């Protein structure tokens, strides 16, 4: 007999809207046995009617992540095969249109596979398995990837803090095939990018900023560009190809800046007009302000400032401060491309924070474009939490 999770009265409403999370405080009782981490359980409303089938996670606040809302759909190898095929089909047009050899194949809940992220970099598939359900089905997931992508190596980068909330330890390593020498070279919009899936951030690279890199290129011809938190310099790379007069790439990582240099080289771009500055962005911006240095275009792509609600107020202060200083460094009519990758930072709140920064900077600001994650990072209508990357293009007077 299947284990049944009965919800408290009224807690079925979010599931009836197909939201895939059930929190521990919404559970009335567990019937039919004691589920182990990752086990598939049936979820029913307080009156007993069936709602969904999901993975049990006893140590997480999110105690069930729903795999399916279809009562006839079983969770087995065919289930994962179908989900992977559907995700690939949904990206095929984009891949052809933009000439992509690097893209997000599986975007977790937004692709109906909670806790599973898979990125493709040429012939390497990089997985992050971040939930007990994903962990339980690890071998099956890898088997299906090998069947559908027989020419690809499969590498795991489940080395993120969120696994701790599930009671899971970090896991990194090769799951199938042979890993090519690093870096892997991917291509997007005719630009080649070096990616180190072993030592790089996340799964190796920030695929979600692809459309925003192209957006930035519209504003840079003949301009001076300051690229903050540049990582491997790809905003600067797009700027160089688009004819920027000068580019300064700033990051704290020596390795990232070396890769930024390599990216220029593999695209046969001269970098005589590019400065690679290993520095703390927060300190450097203040230094440049004190020195009276200015730029025509500034890109602000900082790391996440808020991991939970208790950090949101502090994050707002951090975003306001850094945007204020950046505005003070822009020439009149200059362009600020500013981002937040904190899922808790709603787009309206982010715009308000940047508007407040403009007041403190004593600059007039016009918002001329909104930016978000690339379309291979879809947002399910039932899972608004999947909308995490927000950006604004602002003209600063």
UniProtKB/Swiss-Prot annotation:
Catalysed reactions, as listed in the record: cytidine(1962) in 23S rRNA + S-adenosyl-L-methionine = 5-methylcytidine(1962) in 23S rRNA + S-adenosyl-L-homocysteine + H(+)
Q: What is its EC number?
A: 2.1.1.191
- Could you tell me the superkingdom of the organism this chain comes from? Bacteria
Provide this UniProt record's keywords sorted from A to Z.
Cytoplasm, Methyltransferase, RNA-binding, rRNA processing, S-adenosyl-L-methionine, Transferase
According to the entry, every stretch annotated as the PUA domain falls at: 2-80
What would you give as a GO molecular function for this chain, any one? RNA binding
> Where found?
Cytoplasm
Q: Which Pfam families match?
A: Methyltrans_SAM, PUA_3
Query: Would the keyword DNA damage turn up in this protein's UniProt record?
Result: no
Q: Name one GO cellular component term.
A: cytoplasm
* Summary of the function given for this chain in its UniProt record: Specifically methylates the cytosine at position 1962 (m5C1962) of 23S rRNA.
Q: Which PANTHER family match?
A: RIBOSOMAL RNA LARGE SUBUNIT METHYLTRANSFERASE (PTHR42873), S-ADENOSYLMETHIONINE-DEPENDENT METHYLTRANSFERASE DOMAIN-CONTAINING PROTEIN (PTHR42873:SF1)
Which family, according to the similarity comment?
Belongs to the methyltransferase superfamily. RlmI family.
Q: What is this protein called?
A: Ribosomal RNA large subunit methyltransferase I
Taxonomic lineage is: Bacteria, Pseudomonadati, Pseudomonadota, Gammaproteobacteria, Alteromonadales
């Amino acid at each position: 007999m299947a284990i049944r999770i009965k919800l408290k009265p009224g807690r079925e409403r979010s599931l009836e809207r197909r939201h895939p999370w059930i929190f521990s405080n919404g559970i009335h009782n567990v019937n039919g046995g004691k589920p182990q981490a990752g086990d598939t359980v049936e979820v029913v409303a307080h009156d007993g009617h069936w709602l969904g089938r999901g993975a049990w996670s006893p140590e997480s606040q999110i105690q069930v992540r729903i795999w399916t809302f279809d009562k006839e759909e079983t969770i087995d190898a065919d289930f994962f095969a179908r989900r992977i095929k559907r995700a690939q089909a949904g990206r095929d047009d984009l891949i052809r249109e933009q000439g992509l050899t690097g893209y997000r194949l599986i975007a977790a809940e937004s692709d109906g596979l909670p806790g599973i992220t898979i990125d493709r970099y040429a012939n390497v598939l990089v997985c992050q398995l971040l939930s007990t359900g994903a962990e339980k089905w690890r071998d099956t997931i890898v088997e299906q990837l090998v069947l559908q992508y027989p020419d690809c190596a499969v590498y795991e980068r489940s080395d993120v803090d969120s696994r701790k909330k599930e009671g899971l330890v970090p896991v990194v390593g090769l799951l199938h095939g042979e890993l090519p020498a690093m870096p892997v070279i991917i291509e997007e919009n005719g630009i080649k990018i070096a990616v180190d899936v072993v030592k790089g951030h996340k799964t190796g690279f920030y695929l979600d900023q692809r459309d925003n890199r192209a957006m930035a290129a519209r504003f840079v011809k003949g301009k001076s560009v300051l690229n903050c938190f540049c990582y491997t310099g790809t905003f600067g790379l797009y700027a160089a190809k688009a004819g920027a007069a000068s580019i300064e790439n700033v990051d704290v990582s020596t390795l990232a800046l070396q890769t930024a240099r390599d990216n220029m080289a593999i695209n046969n771009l001269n970098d005589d007009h590019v400065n690679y500055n290993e520095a703390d962005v927060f300190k450097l911006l203040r230094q440049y302000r004190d020195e009276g240095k200015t730029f025509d275009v500034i890109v602000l792509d900082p790391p996440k400032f808020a991991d939970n609600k208790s950090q949101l107020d502090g994050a707002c202060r951090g975003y306001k401060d850094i945007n204020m200083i950046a505005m003070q460094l822009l020439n009149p009519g200059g362009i600020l491309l500013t981002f937040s990758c904190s899922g808790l930072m709603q787009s309206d709140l982010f715009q308000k924070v940047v508007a407040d920064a403009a007041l403190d900077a004593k600059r007039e600001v016009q918002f001329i474009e909104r930016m978000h994650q690339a379309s291979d990072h879809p947002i399910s209508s039932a899972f608004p939490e999947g909308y995490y990357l927000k950006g604004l293009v602002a003209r600063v007077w």
